[in-house]
Amino acid sequence: MDPNVLTVYKSPFSKVRIGKNYDGGYIIVEIPNVSYTTLIAGGICNDISFEEEFIDKYPDVQTFAFDGTIDQLPTENNKISSFIKKNIGHKNNEHMTNLHDIIDVNERIFIKIDIEGGEIPWIHSLSDDQLNKFEQIVMEFHAPYSEREIEVFNKINKNHYLVHFHANNCCGVRNHRGVIIPNVFECTYLHKKYFQTVELNQDAIPGNLDMKNVSHHDEIYINYPPFVHPSSVV
């Protein structure tokens, strides 16, 4: 993976934290007057704090929650349209879904994914047209450092800009091609249609909305490219 595929840009709008403190909360962009039709949440495990708060914020959204490792939602929530006991991946079978059927019949999708490494083959399975339906993508990546990941990040970057990057302090860092990168990190992508001008991110990481994923581990601080830039000029 070329570290430059993780270039972080300045968001054109303000951001907000959604979900519980520490692990389980994510930073999203507050797009003015946005109307999401669909929230797809993958890898919810025992925490639906993000989904509950998102639905409260966008009450008209239809929500699909996926996790093959649990039998039911951790708490009852009638606002979640559907819980599917399947993991998200690159194919469809009894235990896995690639989500193509839901993506193909919906527009203005918000997707939030934490599927413990399954994100790479899943993105590989998507077409550009399917990715283009995502208004925002919130995704955790798990050690995506082989050459096969370059295509994945290039595919996302075709229609989206990375506007928020946070190191999950669970698992340390590595020196990858001369850049210190977290082994696990959270990304928020915003569709390029929302940008009138494009500027590089100059804000230090973590930001004031971020919280440690693991409270008793040290935070991981980042103040260098491609994440933080001395100038906003692209």
Residue ranges and their predicted role:
Residues 1-40, 47, 53, 84-85, ...:
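Rossmann-like AdoMet/SAM-dependent catalytic core
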Residues 46, 65-73:
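Short, polar loop motifs at secondary-structure junctions
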Residues 54, 71-81, 129:
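Short loop/helix-cap segments at secondary-structure boundaries that form the rim of catalytic
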Residues 56-62:
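Conserved S-adenosyl-L-methionine
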Residues 62-67, 85:
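Conserved SAM-binding motif I beta-strand of class I
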Residues 86-90, 114:
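Conserved acidic residues
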Residues 113-119:
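Switch II (G3) loop of P-loop NTPases
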Residues 121-155:
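A short alpha/beta connector and helix-capping loop motif
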